[in-house]
Amino acid sequence: YLQYTHMFREVDGALYVGQSTYGDLCMHASFATGLIGQSYPPEYSILPGTRLGYPFLVDALSATMLIYGTPLAAAFSVPGTLMTGLIWLGFVLFTWEMTGKKSAVVIAFVLLFFNGGLGFLGTLDRVTSDPTALNDALNGYYQTPTNMPDVNLRWVNALCDLLVPQRTLMAGWLCVLPALYLLVAAMRERRAAAFLAVGLWAGPMPMIHTHSFLALGVISLGAMIDCLLREKKRRLRTLLLFALYGAAACALALPQLLEWTFPQTVGGGSLRILFNWVNNDGNGGLKDEYFWFWIKNVGLVYLIFPLAALTIRKPAVKALSLGCLLLYALAETVVFQPNVYDNNKLFFVAFLAMLPAAAEILTDIYARLKGIRGRCVLAAAFILASTLSGAITIVREAKSEYQIFGKEQVEAAAFIRENTLEDGL
């Protein structure tokens, strides 16, 4: 539904988008339309002579559809809808591979796509003194309890603020979920072909979504370290298997990184040290107390992650837990792009990779409480506290509607496209 309403929906000749796509979609549209007829490697259409360093392959898909006559809205909404559905399916399969429990699959799915921290408490508190506060949350521009920078709520809802507007991230998750699935299977089977398959899948990822590629690499490094520490008798074989995976991935990825990523990140001065993400006040201090910042943003499940990592004995959970911890630490200390906020693209991969284990722990806790009166109430309270902020955000996003281009602007653009040369000035 959001892929339809938020992607240049035409109403009486004007084009409409949603709250979350009001900014991002125009950028992606400029990439998709600018790629048509370009030489290779492509350049920014608004900055001739400047190489397009942004991962552009998902927008190249829309560009191909435009070339074959697909309307602008459909060129974005159709692949977006298909990719979102595949991400849902991929996460379900990944969670099943990790847990083997239907209840854990349902819980993990709900916690990911209805995710939200404790921001709803602030909204409800404001309602007691100002009855219009709830109306603001449901109708105001970025007043939802998952994304309010003025009170340091920055974790956002994965569905509304990541998958719908951020098309490269959507494509990145489409690739990283199968990669994690293949990695877990490879660690279990210990066959060279399985590790080679992970590497061949991961290699093309940099120009699909560089952050997802980096996240997968760091998680894989942590998983390798865990395997080497636990399996002393077959360390050499383990090291060789992971080396095969890494060699295959690097052989495919390195040309992309050298051509696009490194010049923009290192040469552009984006790489720098910064502790605690957006909670850093820029003056050597923190806006909120460290753990409170994460608890109020991520929610109660943040407290479940270390419990899952420490108590579940499954080798795959142990391996991915160490990898996610390394990724979390890296994203907490190093910024890879001009906008500090975009490190959430790394945090969220660790988040989704740990959710299956967290969901399994929650099902185990519920089972251990059998016979205790009120366990259903406790479970419902946990789920409600973990999803209410996200639910409010989804309702608000579904209601949002903004005109991005008026009828006259659309007609002017069509006239220019039909009556000027492609290389005209």
Can you describe what each PLM-predicted range is?
Residues 177-186, 219-225, 297-318, 364:
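Hydrophobic, aromatic-rich transmembrane alpha-helices
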Residues 193-202, 219, 242-247, 313-335, ...:
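Transmembrane alpha-helix segments characteristic
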Residues 1-175, 210, 214, 399-403:
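Active-site lumenal/periplasmic loops and adjacent helix-entry segments of GT-C-fold
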Residues 81-84, 169, 214-217, 339-367:
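Hydrophobic/aromatic-rich transmembrane helices and adjacent perimembrane loops
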Residues 186-194, 229-243, 305-325, 368-376:
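Membrane-interface helix-loop-helix junctions at transmembrane boundaries of multi-pass membrane enzymes
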Residues 374-425:
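Extracytoplasmic
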Residues 160-162, 194-209:
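Membrane-interface alpha helices of multi-pass inner-membrane proteins
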